Amino acid sequence: MEVAVPEEPQKKIFRARKTMKMSDRQQLEVLHNTLATTNSSLSSSPPQTPLMNGTHTETEKDLNNKEGDLMAPATDSARCSPSPSFPVSRSPSPPNTQTTSPAMDLEDPLVATEEKKETSNKSSSSSPSASPAGLNCDPEVKEGFLCLSEEDETQADKDEKDSSEEKMNVDAETEDQKEEKDEKDTDTPENAEDNSAPVGLKRTLSEEKDEDDKEIEEERDGKRARLEGEELEAQLELKITANGGNRDKIEKMVQQLVEERLRVLQLTVFDRSLKELKDRVEKIDNVTKQQNALQHINTLQAKISRLAKKFGAANQASENAKRTQDAQAAAAAAQANNATNATTPQRTVKTTVDSKLSSSPTVSNSTAVPAQPKPLSTPATPTSSALATTAPILQIISTTTSSTPSSTSLPGQSQTGTLLLKTGPNPTVMTNAPATSGGQPVAMQQLLIQLPLAMANGQSGALVNAAGGVGLIPVSSLSTVSNINKAKTTTPATTFMLQKTAGNVSSATSSAPAVSLARAVYPGGTGTVSSPNTGISVTTARTPTQCAAVVGVSTAAASPGTTGPAATGSAAAAAGSPSASALASKTDNQASTPKTASQPGRPKGSVIDLTEDDDDVQVTGVQKATVSPVTTQRSSGPPPLVSSTPNTGTGVRSAQRSTVDSPSQSRPSSSSSTSLPPLPLAPSPPARLPPEANHTSPPQQPQLKLARVQSQNGIVLSWCVAETDRNCAAVDTYHLYAYHQDHQSSVSGASAQMLWKKIGEVKALPLPMACTLTQFVSGSTYYFAVRAKDVYGRFGPFCEPQCTDVITPASSAST
């Protein structure tokens, strides 16, 4: 009888759950014990092969028949014996074996349970098991493979398999197996010869079995990696050879192993569930934190918005308070104006203005009589002579300066002036002429008048009456703009104080309650100026003039006949500083000598732009005499009466006050010129100049502009040149000079004590250049001058000196 060694005839595989009990082994024992009696039925029965779930070869059938023949005498004793001599294997029991095996009656409950278990496995249903091991079964655990062997061999080989493959040390089982081995040794020689074939077969099967174990372990490890797929497939292969007496022990051991594996599986599932739960909790915590953060951010944004609203409301309230104060001040000014109109006697005052014109013989000072049909002006000769010989009555002095003087600026600018009417000492009584409506002297109250003055380049001149009595003194400036080009588009407001000066005042014989102010208008400007009230009317007079270096409009009362208004050719900006100046005019190229009266407050919103091109004229308005004359466009009104007056002196004339002015009238607001100390002489050029220096000329004369920096309490000096000369050598440095004129010394006339001092040198950069000076003494006047030094050591001419005040608006209002 030959056996195919490469094949596995003795290996029977069936599907079973992982928690299968020892009842299956009992079934297998019953099957092996009944093989001798039911050999024919088993060999011819077709359901036998499907029940074992294996492939039965002819060798296997022959081996089963041989086993049945060999073990036939001992069948009855084996059924009752506690330790059968057949190997124990797991296999589902067929239904017909339950009726043929007497030993199955003892294990009916277990057999029934296992039948249910097998039925549920085949139908892929997970019905609960009645056995204790079935209760521990995990529903997720799938069915595995269980390999069983039924070969008939010696107990020694079975012990080796049991110890090597299963690695379970069972002492009691080993003793029983030894007893069975002794019984096997007493068998017939045929049995020994027949057993030789299964022994050789078993060796081959054990080698194959070891390989299968490795494959199953690797496959089981691979299956366990599918934890995330919610599918677990357990494979358990057992090969147990023992007698029937060790069934309980083996059952307990297998159950223990299965429970351990199941516990590991449950712990794995529990760990996975716990990890998922932790992840969910973390996500929930993160979402909660984000919501809290968003809520906190929203709260902060709401607080910020509320604070912004509060700040906005506070700013609005402060602005409203300022507007209210301004309105109250305007109302008080209007009331004071009404009171002054009620108490002022009716008279007509003519204002005399002097214009600095060029040396052209066809243009001179002129008297303009308003051609309006109202009795605003009195052309009577006695009144004119009286006004000409007495002290000045009305003075208008500008406080706001701009950067764009002379005829090169735009003509559409205007300023708003405020006139403060203030009475002064009047030692004489007006008795030289009868007044129709009452000639008694009445004290004049203070009066604030907003008066828009259209000046060239935003620069207001000085209107001074030669007939004494009332003077306009600057009080404050509501807007002071940049010293270069910002004045072209802004309308600063100037405040004047109308103050009555001491001196003999003659009353007018006219009954018209008006003061006629002859207004100086630049060429091409507007011809009408709104009058502040019924008591003061402003008319304009124009004559064709030439661009002259007129720094201010001042009094010129050389003869009694020089009365009446004159038109200024172009009022010049005064020094670029925010000082209120009544400036006297000088020659075309000489430096103007402004004498400041007060300093207005510079607004915070003013902008200083030091990037103006060279086409801007210097601040003082001094230009070359070669400028072509500019003709004036006549206004639509009737032409004024012009009476020419001869100019005394040569082409250079400084405006002087009238000879009848009292000494008390010489105040800082007057237009008397202030003599400046001579500028330092330029040092001699180097004795030896390089050859290339002979082809170049000394540096050009710079043009200086001044501006105030209110926030830093400083003065900005900026300079440039009118037109760049290519023949001049490169400039190395600029030298800055200044001298400090005290206010009291200017009043006392101690100008000889003023000396120029060098305040520093600035490395030359591309023009225009600027620098800022700080740390000044309040209440003083400063004059500045700049000259250039080229790379060969030669000095150029000084610029026209510029002046500025360092004085507070309060002090100017008190002067």
Swiss-Prot record:
By its UniProt entry, which PROSITE patterns does this protein fall under?
Answer: FN3
Where do the record's region annotations for Disordered lie? 1-228, 315-385, 400-438, 579-704
Does Cell membrane appear among the keywords?
A: no
Q: Tell me where in this chain the PTM Phosphoserine is found.
A: 125, 127, 628
A single GO cellular-component term from the record reads: nucleus
Q: Which residues form the Fibronectin type-III domain?
A: 698-811
- UniProt lists compositionally biased (Pro residues) regions at 677-689
Could you tell me which Pfam families the record lists for this protein?
A: ATF7IP_BD (PF16788), fn3_4 (PF16794)
What InterPro entries is this protein classified in? ATF7-int, ATF7IP_BD, Fn3_ATF7IP, FN3_dom, FN3_sf, Ig-like_fold
- Keywords in alphabetical order: Activator, Coiled coil, Nucleus, Phosphoprotein, Repressor, Transcription, Transcription regulation
Q: Which residues carry this modification: Phosphothreonine?
A: 344
Specify whether Transcription is a keyword of the entry. Answer: yes
Write out the biased-composition intervals (Low complexity): 34-46, 81-102, 121-133, 326-346, 375-385, 400-418, 662-676
Q: Cross-referenced Gene3D superfamilies, in alphabetical order?
A: Immunoglobulins
In this chain, composition skew of type Acidic residues spans 208-219
User: GO terms for biological process?
Assistant: DNA methylation-dependent constitutive heterochromatin formation; regulation of DNA-templated transcription
Coiled-coil ranges per the record?
164-311
Residue ranges with Basic and acidic residues bias = 57-69, 155-170, 178-187
Name its cellular compartments: Nucleus
Indicate the family of this protein.
Belongs to the MCAF family.
Name it. Activating transcription factor 7-interacting protein 1
